């Protein structure tokens, strides 16, 4: 190998650093995939990250998805910035559902009132994405309504407990029928 090729190889060494954005569940950071390999490639101690993340999120209900930014420094240390839970988490919790609609626009997965949307907007307005750009609360509300639509959640003006309970019972029947249809389709496909 010539001196020139060795010199260029030493110049092209990748510099450790950068930002990794990910959604990690509170108290559930583990050394395995998906974050383990990414941090390992950057030379960051995976066990140290898991320990620090789980320590910082110990006061938060376990399993809540948290947007996380990991700033990797050139000396291969890191700095964590943990955001608030995602809008979809808040909307699904307010609607009392686990998943959004399978066919958005054709089915309604849940119901939330404008009061719920306003409360979520008040919390998310403090988030970096909105606070840094000085976004007015009305725009945050519209953004959350758009997210609700994409999840198949209908936003209604007022919502009583009885209306919500009736909707959830109707939705449970619909999901059971949908699951039966899926199982029948799988059985039919297996026969072929």
Swiss-Prot record:
Keywords: Mitochondrion, Ribonucleoprotein, Ribosomal protein, Transit peptide. GO terms for cellular component: mitochondrial inner membrane; mitochondrial large ribosomal subunit; mitochondrion. Its main location: mitochondrion. One of its GO terms (biological process) is translation. NCBIfam families: L11_bact. It is found in: Mitochondrion. One of its GO terms (molecular function) is structural constituent of ribosome. This is Large ribosomal subunit protein uL11m. The keyword Mitochondrion applies. Belongs to the universal ribosomal protein uL11 family. Gene3D superfamilies: Ribosomal protein L11, C-terminal domain, Ribosomal protein L11/L12, N-terminal domain. Component of the mitochondrial ribosome large subunit (39S) which comprises a 16S rRNA and about 50 distinct proteins.
